[in-house]
């Protein structure tokens, strides 16, 4: 199950006490801020959570799975996320408690 923006808005409404309009504006502004920073080539560091950064990937050979024909996969820039140590520890603790 995925956490959606709508669910984030609901949680802000329930747990923080923002009204739904304010909560939606907050969530939208947060993602706009992240998007703008990445568009400017900035790294995003969220303490206790992780880092978002841009990575350049070189062109490489690929293959059309239907025909087997070799095709080039063009160079591109991708967004990567590296989880922080605190997030890793919390996820590990949660996963460990479910086994």
Swiss-Prot record:
| Keywords assigned by UniProt, alphabetized | DNA recombination, DNA-binding, Transcription, Transcription regulation, Translation regulation
Does the keyword field hold DNA-binding? yes
Domain of life of the organism encoding this protein: Bacteria
Asked whether the UniProt record includes DNA-binding among its keywords, one would answer yes
Task: Cite the SUPFAM superfamilies for this sequence.
Answer: IHF-like DNA-binding proteins
GO terms for CC? Answer: cytosol
Q: Which GO annotations describe the biological process of this protein?
A: DNA recombination; positive regulation of metabolic process; regulation of DNA-templated transcription; regulation of translation
Pfam families given in the database record: Bac_DNA_binding
- Supply the Gene3D superfamilies for this chain: IHF-like DNA-binding proteins (4.10.520.10)
- Job description of the protein: This protein is one of the two subunits of integration host factor, a specific DNA-binding protein that functions in genetic recombination as well as in transcriptional and translational control.
| Subunit structure of this chain's protein | Heterodimer of an alpha and a beta chain.
From the Swiss-Prot or TrEMBL record, give the protein name.
Integration host factor subunit alpha
Query: Which organism is this entry from?
Result: Xylella fastidiosa (strain Temecula1 / ATCC 700964)
């Amino acid at each position: 199950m995925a956490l959606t923006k709508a669910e984030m808005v609901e949680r802000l409404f329930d747990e923080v006490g923002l009204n739904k309009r304010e909560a939606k504006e907050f969530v939208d502004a947060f993602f706009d801020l992240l998007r703008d920073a990445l568009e400017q080539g900035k790294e995003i560091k969220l303490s206790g959570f992780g880092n978002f950064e841009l990575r350049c990937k070189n062109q490489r050979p690929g293959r059309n799975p239907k025909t087997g024909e070799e095709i080039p996969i063009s160079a591109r820039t991708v967004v990567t996320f590296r989880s922080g140590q605190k997030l890793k520890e919390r996820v590990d603790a949660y996963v460990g408690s479910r086994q």
